[in-house]
Amino acid sequence: MFQFQFPLYNDIVEQARREAVEAGFEELRTPEDVDAAFRRPGTTLVLINSVCGCAGGIARPAAAHAVHYDKRPDHLVTVFAGQDKEATARAREYFVGEPPSSPSFALLKDGKLCAMLHRHDIEGHEPVAVVQKLQALFDEYCEEV
C-alpha cells in the first residue's frame, strides 16, 4: 500500500509537543495516562495542545509563562488534539458540559472540572491576556507554592 510521509507536518507536531514538555507539562498519550493523571489529588492544569497557529503563537507561550506565579496548579499535563486522539477523547470526558475545543485549557481539582478556557478565549488575544486569565484561575483555585 502507498503511504504518504509528511516530514514538515511531523516536525511541526514534534515541535508543539516539545514546547509543552519544555514548559513543564507532562504528556498524556493514552487514556490510561489521562485517568492516572486526573486521579491525582490537588489541582491539575490541562493544556489541550494543537498544531494551529493560535496554539503555537498564544496558548503554549501563555502556558509556559502563566505557571511562573505564586499560586499555580500542583500538576501540569497536556493531551494533543488530532494526534493522541484516544487520550484527548478521554480527557474531554472529564470536561462535563463543555464542548470540544483546541487549543484550550482545563483546570481540575481532585479530578473535577473547575474552569475552562476555550479556543475563543485564546484565539485573537495576546498571550499576556491568556496568561492573566490563567493566573486569575490559579488565584481562585490553587494554593501558593
Swiss-Prot record:
Superkingdom classification of source: Bacteria
One Pfam family cited in the UniProt record for this chain: Disulph_isomer
Classification via InterPro entries: BrxB/BrxA
Disulfide links within the chain: none
GO biological process terms on file: cell redox homeostasis
Gene3D superfamilies (alphabetical): Glutaredoxin (3.40.30.10)
Family label: Belongs to the bacilliredoxin family.
Name under which the protein is recorded: Bacilliredoxin GK2368
Species assigned in the record: Geobacillus kaustophilus (strain HTA426)
